Each structure stands twice: as C-alpha cells, then as structure tokens.
C-alpha cells in the first residue's frame, strides 16, 4: 500500500518477492502519482519472474487512458485500475494479441482512500475457480490470505494491510523471514470449515473471505451480508 507519506525500498521488496517465488503483485495507491514517479517504482519489478503487476491508483485528470496504456505497453506485465474516477470505462491492452490477460486499463467510480475500503463480501464478489487447483485452494486454504504477504503504507509487514497484527517493518525486517513465522503462516490454513457460520454456507469454497474486519479469528466477516440459514442477501449492505 502507498500513500503520500510512504517511503518504501522498492528494490529490496522486488528482490525478496522474487526470492519467495511470488508471481502476482498488487500496488494500492491512495493518492495520485506522476507517471515518472510511478515508472520509477515499476522499474524495480521489471525483468523479474512476476506474471502480473496490478496497479490500483487514484484518478488524476491530467493522465489519460492512453498514457496508462502506453506505460503498460512498456511494462507488459502491468495493468491499471484507476479509482475515484468520475466515469467508468475499460480500455483493452495495446498488446492484447500477445498478452491477453494483462496490460488493460480500467477506470472505476469507487473511492478507495485507505485499507479500510477492503473486505466487502456480497453476491458480486465470489470468485469462481478456473480449474480444480483453484477450487481445492478454496477447500483447503484461506482464499484471501493463502501465500499472501503485504506491506502497509507505513512499511509494516502483515498478512493483509487491513489486518492489525504486525510481523516487522520492511525497513529492517525480511519478507523471507516473516514467511517462516508459524503465526504468520497459520492464516493460510484457516479455511471456511473452521469459521463459524461460513462453514455452513454454500458459497464457502468460492468466497474470498476476510480476516481483517472480524470480531475474532474464527468469526464470519463483518462485511459479509449473506445469511446461509435463510439463503438471503441483505441488499442494503451490498453497496
């Protein structure tokens, strides 16, 4: 996560994530950023073995969809989602015939101002598996936290930026050492069968879950609006 006060060592982060065999990276920027500064960050992650780099960034009227598309063309693993936009739109990758999954630019109206804007679970947030491996991950592991490691705006290392427990700070701690921590890894194995109410839900194996906004570790997510006992969604909470 990145805000106006963040001062991350992106080179160190890129090296350690590659050593951990990380394949997918997401940057969440709660502020605008000039393209030159954004490129300075991305340059640390290029020519490394990352399959996709998703950049969630705040809308800036001076930066056009074409500007983002050209930057994504320069760094083919990168895609952009521009939040807090006045209009919604989707723009296909300039390299879609070569890299059909990445390189796109999407503008969304949703305001994302902090990590508190995460964790909403509704009937639009379910992720249906693409294959047996994806399905079994939902059965055996936690869909949100399995093999995930995060750095919040202050550099604190967590399972998720929205969670409270801190395992160190990237300024003086290693992502590799944190991944060896049994307490950190325990959340990877917290599947839906161990969570109250969720274990009875028919969506449990396709739900992304959330362990940040909860009363305790084994409770249903507070931002989930589904009742599996009467098969109903509370539509008022879905927005």
Please annotate each region the language model reported:
Residues 1-11, 17-36, 50-62, 78-87:
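Core AdoMet radical
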